[in-house]
Amino acid sequence: MTQTPVKIAVTGAAGQICYSLLFRIASGSLLGDTPIELRLLEITPALKALEGVVMELDDCAFGNLVNIEIGDDPKKVFDGVNAAFLVGAMPRKAGMERSDLLTKNGAIFTAQGKALNDVAADDVRVLVTGNPANTNALIAATNAVDIPNNHFAALTRLDHNRAKTQLARKTGKTVNDVRHMTIWGNHSSTQYPDVFHAEVAGQKATNLVNEAWIENEFIPTVAKRGAAIIDARGASSAASAANATVECMRDWMGSTPEGDWVSMAIPSDGSYGVPEGLISSFPVTITNGKVEIVQGLDIDDFSRAKIDASAKELADERDAVKELGLI
């Protein structure tokens, strides 16, 4: 019996992140040999460019990619999808107020949330990469009234990966030696990369690095890495964001490695004092697609203040989109 293809929607499909992401998905980085059908959404002016991307996907002759559909109508593109990568978003431009950014993205994610609600498969998982990712995910989830909130998440895996690399470099080890890294809060400069539970080659990270490095180098480097990449290459991180996006959804559709956890922004259940309903990053384990927040971690005063500050920013963003009538 022929296996039914998994339908995967990707928005902003002609953009920079997707120029890396689509080829990773199609080559099997997400679901291995499982047959897939790509559903690609773009704004009308970008459809011509998207046709060129589809030509390149065709020219790769990926064995598990059985079909590609493109369009500018989310209700058509999202029909029956099992996974949705919401990558397309309005970037903040010079002189743009935060409320303008939230309004413009609010319109995008309101429409996409409603479309997913109406036509996506019952098992759909929705991962938001387009920034401000946490609040965009909240808007989409709130407008998808029939889809459980725990089917929505925002990407903090890129921050998680950045943090692992910085700790591995500092300790002279490899990223494979680093376990139990945690990102808390918002995917913004208030995020809190937490090494206090991390291990490097079986040793507590805090026995290998000092607090001055953690506070003055590690946290700012991870939190501001996106800006540093823009300064260096004149464009935002795309390939690394695509890689993290694939890794996050791959784990979400499967399981995290035994004995480790990952970071993922999901609707808070009140754990660690993060107000319920905010889409905030937590340490999570995943077993056969079921996501659970790691419980019982000791949070010292330093970490408490950092987690609270990022949660406050998320609450402020939620309140702002409420005032704008988006949720």
UniProtKB/Swiss-Prot annotation:
Belongs to the LDH/MDH superfamily. MDH type 2 family. One of its GO terms (biological process) is tricarboxylic acid cycle. It catalyses: (S)-malate + NAD(+) = oxaloacetate + NADH + H(+). SUPFAM superfamilies: LDH C-terminal domain-like, NAD(P)-binding Rossmann-fold domains. Pfam families: Ldh_1_C (PF02866), Ldh_1_N (PF00056). InterPro entries: L-lactate/malate_DH, Lactate/malate_DH_C, Lactate/malate_DH_N, Lactate_DH/Glyco_Ohase_4_C, Malate_DH_AS, Malate_DH_type2, NAD(P)-bd_dom_sf. Keywords: NAD, Oxidoreductase, Tricarboxylic acid cycle. Substrate binds at R92, R98, N131, R162. The active site is at H187 (proton acceptor). It comes from the Bacteria. Catalyzes the reversible oxidation of malate to oxaloacetate. This is Malate dehydrogenase. The keyword NAD applies. NAD(+) binds at G12, A13, A14, G15, Q16, I17, C18, N105, Q112, T129, G130, N131. GO terms for molecular function: L-malate dehydrogenase (NAD+) activity. It comes from Cutibacterium acnes (strain DSM 16379 / KPA171202). The keyword NAD applies. NCBIfam families: MalateDH-SF1 (TIGR01759), PRK05442.1 (NF003916).
